[in-house]
Amino acid sequence: MNKVLYIKANAKPEGKSRTFKISDVFIDEYKQNNPDDEIITLDLYKEDIDFLRSKDLDTVFGPKNEESKNHPTLKYAYQFAEADKYVIAAPMWNLSIPAILKAYVDYISVVGIAFKYTQEGAVGLLENKKAVYIAARGGSYAETPYELDGIYLRSILGFFGIKDITTISAEKLDVQGENVDKILEEAIDKAKETAKNF
């Protein structure tokens, strides 16, 4: 049985978020194909996530032991490390990710949990896992230098050792004259197909 962490990062509620329209279908399709897997939903806007403070840094960068698992600053890092698969649903905002998702990444980017330092440099500790990033975007940014949301998430996940990463994006949703329903339908179809083999 695999443990799937479904990370949601959008201030818009269910029903209004175009990103969640796609990601929720992905999760439903995944459940149908993997009924025994555990899916944990983490809605970041419903969590008490703040930016890391100076008092948190010693905990994040210091040595870890059994008691570390009970430290409130490290709870997201341990939860992330315990998962086998990740579904990250977040819209592109201002060419990047929502600030709350970046704050969350800071909480999970923990030495000794997500990666470690060696004489050769940093080494990811989360190998043999996979992730899918699902995003709604107002313009057309896929595979361009402006796709900073996807570039960043693929980079940080790769830094953790996660190399199997798929991006599903609905592009041009705010471009005048585009058929938004058709764009979303195509992204949902891709989400369904991706979920079958995820």
UniProtKB/Swiss-Prot annotation:
<comment type="similarity">
    <text>Belongs to the azoreductase type 1 family.</text>
</comment>
<keyword id="KW-0288">FMN</keyword>
<dbReference type="InterPro" id="IPR050104">
    <property type="entry name" value="FMN-dep_NADH:Q_OxRdtase_AzoR1"/>
</dbReference>
<keyword id="KW-0285">Flavoprotein</keyword>
<dbReference type="GO" id="GO:0010181">
    <property type="term" value="F:FMN binding"/>
</dbReference>
<protein>
    <recommendedName>
        <fullName>FMN-dependent NADH:quinone oxidoreductase</fullName>
        <ecNumber>1.6.5.-</ecNumber>
        <ecNumber>1.7.1.17</ecNumber>
    </recommendedName>
</protein>
<dbReference type="Pfam" id="PF02525">
    <property type="entry name" value="Flavodoxin_2"/>
</dbReference>
<dbReference type="GO" id="GO:0009055">
    <property type="term" value="F:electron transfer activity"/>
</dbReference>
<comment type="subunit">
    <text>Homodimer.</text>
</comment>
<dbReference type="InterPro" id="IPR023048">
    <property type="entry name" value="NADH:quinone_OxRdtase_FMN_depd"/>
</dbReference>
<dbReference type="InterPro" id="IPR003680">
    <property type="entry name" value="Flavodoxin_fold"/>
</dbReference>
<keyword id="KW-0520">NAD</keyword>
<keyword id="KW-0560">Oxidoreductase</keyword>
<comment type="function">
    <text>Quinone reductase that provides resistance to thiol-specific stress caused by electrophilic quinones.</text>
</comment>
<dbReference type="GO" id="GO:0016652">
    <property type="term" value="F:oxidoreductase activity, acting on NAD(P)H as acceptor"/>
</dbReference>
<feature type="binding site">
    <location>
        <begin position="92"/>
        <end position="95"/>
    </location>
    <ligand>
        <name>FMN</name>
    </ligand>
</feature>
<dbReference type="InterPro" id="IPR029039">
    <property type="entry name" value="Flavoprotein-like_sf"/>
</dbReference>
<comment type="function">
    <text>Also exhibits azoreductase activity. Catalyzes the reductive cleavage of the azo bond in aromatic azo compounds to the corresponding amines.</text>
</comment>
<dbReference type="GO" id="GO:0016655">
    <property type="term" value="F:oxidoreductase activity, acting on NAD(P)H, quinone or similar compound as acceptor"/>
</dbReference>
